[in-house]
Design a protein with these regions (language model features):
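Extended amphipathic alpha-helical segments enriched in small hydrophobics
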Residues: 313-340
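An aromatic/glycine/proline-enriched structural segment found at the starts
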Residues: 2-7, 12, 158, 162, ...
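M16/MPP (pitrilysin/insulinase) zinc-metallopeptidase core fold and M16-derived inactive scaffolds
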Residues: 29, 34-99, 165, 273-292, ...
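A structural supersecondary motif
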Residues: 251-255, 274-315, 355
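Acidic/histidine-enriched segments that form metal/cofactor-coordinating
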Residues: 39, 66-69, 73-184, 205, ...
Length: 428
């Protein structure tokens, strides 16, 4: 495929003396740039008593540094360079993206890097109010979370932090102290547990010099060790009654292998066979032919060691059993029949184009390499696409069989009729 040749691009990977891995990804001609730090810190590394602490730390670093001791002062210093910072806490990583013009993004990065070495953590009580409001957005009047994604993950991975909500609990957030923040920062925010990826129309030497100034004296520390789930999921159906809503939120899910397993790439092919555009199987059958849902999606969420494959939909309460039946039928078809050549070729082409598009967006290019390296994936755009294209129809079918041939798990938040619950349970 000629497009594969277009995915080769310049890059430099190096390690600072303190163990921080740095990726430099030049994007000639692009006027915007991204300096992104990925830290292996998230809810899967927490305990019941510390659940939510990773998310709290992510909020609190924006409160300033010793040199810029307030949120306003920190943001002003960065925004004067035409840049801004975005951050996200996930299950297995926390990302910080300094986004700005290529001329000034490295200066903005150096300013923001101060918060990892010398955060001030001022205004914690004020920030707790914001965090409390964020959590309460997903709670019902009885204080129960109605986030179906959280409910599904808890169902798939019981008694393990992979089943925790990233935002934590109201009780934990109220109890956390500045000392807790400092302890968490000291454990996870260290050079050997992070990766810096910088993408833009920048000189490699300039990036390396800026990275050295910004992070060269960051403490080395130790990388985090994963604890792989060992407890089997035992509840095929869980539901939370949420009266008053017009629709029920559904997740039909399966446990999977992790991002480095042999089946990881075939599962990505399976994902795209099911849900890759409005012409894909899921949209065609569920929306166009059956009219069951307006919003429907499917995806493989692969962590370093394990993962999950979900079919998600919001449907009228009475249509929930039909939606579950269709999800089970469509995944069963993927497990028992090979995809037609024309369909597989379309999926391959669209994947190549989507990966090539990363070269146009520095932050997306940085994310591909930075988050991938944090998961232990030593791949490039070209090698990722080559391995995707190399998956034939039988290999995709076999991977689907290994996942969808196992127990399916259904989570639902909504006002399900009892008859609907019985129908769903009978399918499982």
């Amino acid at each position: 495929m000629d497009l594969l040749k277009q995915l080769e691009h310049p890059r430099e990977e190096l390690v600072l003396d303190n163990g921080l891995r740095v990726l430099v990804l030049p994007t000639p001609g692009r006027v915007s740039a991204a300096a992104s730090l990925y830290v292996k810190c998230g809810s899967r590394f927490e305990e019941v008593s510390t659940n939510g602490l990773s998310h709290v730390v992510e909020h609190m670093v924006f409160r300033g540094s010793e040199r810029h001791p307030t949120s306003a002062a920190l943001n002003l210093a960065i925004e004067e360079h035409g840049a801004h910072v975005e951050a996200t806490t996930s299950v297995d990583l926390t990302s910080y993206e300094v986004l700005g013009p290529r001329e000034t993004v490295l200066e903005a990065m150096e300013i923001f890097a101060e918060v990892f070495r010398a955060p001030c953590f001022e205004g914690f009580d004020v920030e707790k109010q914001i965090l409390k409001a964020e959590i309460e957005e997903e709670l019902d009047e009885q204080g129960r979370s109605y986030d179906v994604s959280d409910l599904s993950r808890k169902q798939l991975y019981p008694q393990h932090p992979l089943g925790f909500a990233v935002s934590g609990t109201l009780a934990n957030v109220a109890r956390f102290t500045v000392a807790d923040l400092q302890k968490h920062l000291a454990r996870f925010y260290v050079a050997s547990n992070a990766i810096l990826a910088v993408a833009g129309d920048l000189r490699i030497d300039d990036v390396v010099a800026a990275a050295q100034r910004a992070f060269g004296d960051w403490r080395r520390g130790d990388p985090v060790v994963l604890e792989t789930p060992s407890v089997a999921a035992k509840k095929p159906f869980v539901a939370l009654d949420d009266p008053g809503g017009a629709q029920s939120d559904l997740r039909v899910a399966w446990r999977t292998v992790g991002a480095r397993a042999d089946d990881a790439r075939p599962l990505q092919v399976v994902e795209r066979l099911l849900d890759d555009g409005l012409a894909a199987r899921l949209q065609k059958r569920v929306v166009d032919e059956k009219g069951l849902a307006y919003h429907v999606s499917a995806g493989a969420d692969l962590f370093e060691d394990v993962g999950a494959f979900d079919v998600a939909a919001s449907v009228a309460h009475g249509k929930a059993p039909t939606m579950v039946r269709e999800a089970l039928q469509m995944t069963r078809e993927l497990a028992t029949s090979v995809a037609p050549d024309a369909e597989l070729d379309r999926v391959r082409r669209r994947y190549v184009w989507s990966q090539r598009a990363l070269l146009d967006v520095p932050r997306d290019l940085a994310s591909f390499y930075g988050s991938g390296r944090l998961l232990g994936l030593d791949e490039t755009l070209a090698s990722a696409v080559a391995s995707f294209v190399d998956v034939d129809a039988e290999r995709a079918r076999a991977a689907a069989e290994r996942v969808f041939g196992a127990q399916a798990f259904v989570a639902c938040v909504g006002e399900l009729p009892r008859s609907a619950e019985r129908q769903i349970k009978a399918m499982l």
